Amino acid sequence: MSTSSSSSDNGAGGSGGVFEAPSPSRPRRGANDVWPEPFLESLAVQVAVNASTSAGLLAAAPALANVFRVCTTWHAVSRSDHLWQLLSRQVWARTHLMHDTWRDEFIYRHRTARNFRTRTHTYFTLQFDPSDVDEPDSLSCRCLTLSDLYLAAGFADGTVRLFLLNNRLHVRTLRPPLRDRFGRFSRAVSGIVISDSRLTFATMDGDIHVAEIDGVGHTRTAYAGDIVNDGALVDFTGCGRWWVGLFAGVPGRAFHIWDCNSEETTFVGGTLTDPEAVMGWHTLTELTTSLGRLRISGNETAVACTRWRIMVIDLRNQGVIIGEDEEQRRGLIVTGFDANDEAYVRLDSRGNASVRRVNTQQTVCEFRVSGAAQRRVMGCVNRLHALMCAGGIMRVWEVERGEYLYSIRERVGEVDAIVADDRHVAVASASSTAQSIIHLWDFGAL
């Protein structure tokens, strides 16, 4: 384990600072004392939201401190846990309490974001027992997924290894039921979805498997893929209600949507991957460049990227296209694409990156990724930052204005998979032994 920090004062130290809501130096009485608490809570939330919108999410806390300084009545509202619950949801999009109080939750999210901006983190490599595999591809990681509690890694033989984030231990290995293969990589994991109590993963042959995270029961197949009629499942993701798959191999069947409660298919269609139909079949038998990426943005919107086009679809309305973004001249680097709840990052073949709104495709900011034209690039995004890895070096930009922040000190080699949320970054990279090395950076408030 190593700890890295580029600043001795990252705005997260101690228990004081902007969160203490200091009492005003000259308390004022009168009209301020009769303002009802719900009004003051609404005002504080609005001030925080306005500050985060105009100056960035880290501006919310100082703006709140100014509100709490107005008078003793306004200072008193800072003790309302209901207020901090509203603030955690509106500013940090947190609806699940991970700490003792919502005030603690808000403080933690602010300090973690500050750590991310100032390169303050701890670094680990995750360990697992490789002796239970018998194929050379079995230790090659193909995808990574993060939740609040777990990191899941999907491998080329269909295995998913689950790690607990608080102690970084490998706690469970999941394998799909045995089935005939349609090629060397037909059982490779395409994507993983982690919910509160279960883990769902899909393989390139189109199968979807479900297992309880607590270890009760075996992995079961929720959906049996039809590889002949659908092609290869090149990416898979999901949210609270939906599973979504991106297929390549058969024209007109790019998107598949399932209701994850009933496990029934609700939509099949789309032409996004039609130009990649032939290459879709090659992905089952040989290592190829990534043909497509698929992400959930918000609760019920999916964003997909191929070399030539980005498409936004509405899951509630079963695949209705609500936005398109084409790059017919230079082409896009698929592995440089990712999305958060509001925006996506696209990267063209010359290294020009842009952050665009999911709903409107409006450009938020732009930045340049050096070396993208000559080297393989793997990227991801969280709420505030875009990370791009090329040549073993991972660089970080903020996504509100496109400002370059820093490069991660640890070198990772050739990257096979990458994922980030607001606290963690995980990378799987190749090694000389053919076993993927899983790197983990933790920016949690220290």
Swiss-Prot record:
Any one GO BP annotation for this protein: cell differentiation
Role summary: Transcriptional regulator involved in the specification of floral identity. Acts as A class cadastral protein by repressing the C class floral homeotic gene AGAMOUS in the external flower organs in association with APETALA2 and other repressors. Is required to maintain floral meristem identity in concert with AGAMOUS. Also interacts with APETALA2 to ensure the normal development of ovule.
This protein's name: Transcriptional regulator STERILE APETALA
Additional comment: Mutations in the SAP gene result in the ectopic expression of AGAMOUS, leading to partial homeotic transformation of the external floral organs. Mutations affect equally ovule development and cause floral sterility.
Organs and tissues of expression: Expressed in inflorescence and floral meristems, young floral organ primordia, and later in ovule primordia.
Region entry Disordered, spans: 1-32
Major location (coarse): nucleus
GO MF terms, alphabetically ordered: DNA-binding transcription factor activity
InterPro entries found in the cross-reference section: F-box-like_dom_sf, WD40/YVTN_repeat-like_dom_sf, WD40_repeat_dom_sf
A cellular component annotation (GO) from this entry: nucleus
Compositionally biased intervals (Low complexity): 1-10
Locations listed in the record: Nucleus
Keyword annotations from UniProtKB, A to Z: Developmental protein, Differentiation, Flowering, Nucleus, Repressor, Transcription, Transcription regulation
